[in-house]
């Protein structure tokens, strides 16, 4: 659902991509994790009817590892993290001197900015904490905007370092 939800739609008796001109990116290891052998905890998040049409349409690019310049014309690179789920991609876009990071389920809401505040769905919570700490520190140092997909009030935030750790700069 939210890992790929909205990317496909039913058209008659087929499920097809909603955006026929879009390009989709996924790490090979995450694709295998989601399609070949999803674990019982995550199986409901990786609905094959949402995933396979993207591959079948030829719109999906699978890649290995963190990638700089996955889509250079958009200034896009992808950071891979392993705490929430195996090789989850965090898209990072540089445009007109600004950088924005799609925090995905690593930092889904403003309430999840403090490092110990995690999602209950994380498959490796201690790894999530390490990854989140490193990525948030880097975001502060590089003045990166953070886009949070699940926060209805704070879609894009600026972060700052405080005595309690990284927090919102409000």
Label every model-predicted segment.
Residues 35-38, 73, 91, 113-114, ...:
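Short, well-ordered secondary-structure micro-motifs
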Residues 5, 13, 88, 96-170:
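Cap/insert and terminal regions of metallo-dependent hydrolase folds
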Residues 76-82, 100-105:
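Active-site-proximal beta-strand elements of phosphoester/diester hydrolases
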Residues 30, 66, 82, 95, ...:
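A broadly conserved detector of short glycine/acidic/proline-rich loop/turn motifs that flank catalytic sites
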Residues 1-2, 9-11, 15-80, 130-143:
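Metallo-beta-lactamase
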């Amino acid at each position: 659902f939210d890992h790929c939800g909205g990317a496909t739609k039913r058209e008659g008796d087929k499920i097809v991509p909603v955006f026929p001109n879009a390009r989709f990116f996924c790490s090979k290891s995450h694709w295998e994790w989601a399609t070949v052998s999803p674990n019982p905890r995550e199986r409901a998040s990786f609905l094959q009817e949402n995933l396979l049409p993207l591959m079948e349409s030829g719109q999906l690019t699978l890649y290995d590892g963190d990638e700089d310049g996955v889509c250079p014309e958009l200034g896009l690179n992808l950071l891979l993290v392993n705490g929430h789920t195996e090789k989850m991609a965090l898209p990072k876009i540089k445009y007109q001197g600004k950088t924005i990071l799609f925090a995905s389920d690593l930092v889904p809401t403003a309430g999840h900015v403090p490092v110990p505040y995690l999602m209950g769905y994380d498959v490796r919570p201690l790894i999530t904490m390490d990854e989140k700490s490193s990525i948030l520190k880097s975001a502060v140092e590089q003045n990166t905007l953070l886009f949070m997909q699940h926060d209805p009030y704070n879609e894009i935030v600026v972060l700052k370092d405080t005595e309690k750790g990284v927090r919102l700069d409000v």
